[in-house]
């Protein structure tokens, strides 16, 4: 389901109760992103459960060579680093990294604590290790120096800000870059109804209920419009 389809569903619900109100698509998207994150945390934070691929997003990252991980001592070898910072990932799911060019080696995503201990075993020479550092970039290392020829990767994860990640999505196979509204919104079908409900509820705000200031038991309340 695309951003546009979800926006339409929200606005269609709101027409039932508020014909004279105006809601911008940008604000609806902001709330969709906000409550998507809330619903995914609520559903998956405390249980070990398979998360559907529809909750994940893939972003494209260009890589550059650097002498060390920011904040870590220089070890004399080279690293690859994403050219741009990576959007914040949620603490659910299993991030995955894939090469996007000729390199056929395996890329293994690991914690940043493990990063300092890997990449020294010649028997695992074809494995590239990858981790997100505190500075927000992805770093890559390997025993095999050929990994330095890797130029671009796809990073697949569940991101906190779906809009930010969507703006870094890979182009279509024909090179087309879709507008945000035409892209798939990353949420499983089962969570669409509660997502729409939460967004509509916030946009409606508190329901207006006129008060009987005189408390005289007469049917003389003003019309609520």
Curated annotation (Swiss-Prot):
Transmembrane segments: none
GO terms under cellular component: virion component
Signal is among the record's keywords: no
Source taxon at top rank: Viruses
Keywords: Virion
Keyword match Signal: no
Compartments where located: Virion
Chief site of localization: virion
Chain segments carrying region Disordered: 206-225
Other remarks in the entry: The barrel is composed of five stacked dodecameric ring structures. Podoviridae-like phages usually possess only one such ring. The tail is thus rather long.
Role played: Forms the tail multi-ring barrel with ring protein 1, ring protein 3 and ring protein 4.
Complex formation: Homododecamer.
Protein name as catalogued: Ring protein 2
The species this protein was found in: Bacteroides phage crAss001
Highest classification ranks of the organism: Viruses, Duplodnaviria, Heunggongvirae, Uroviricota, Caudoviricetes
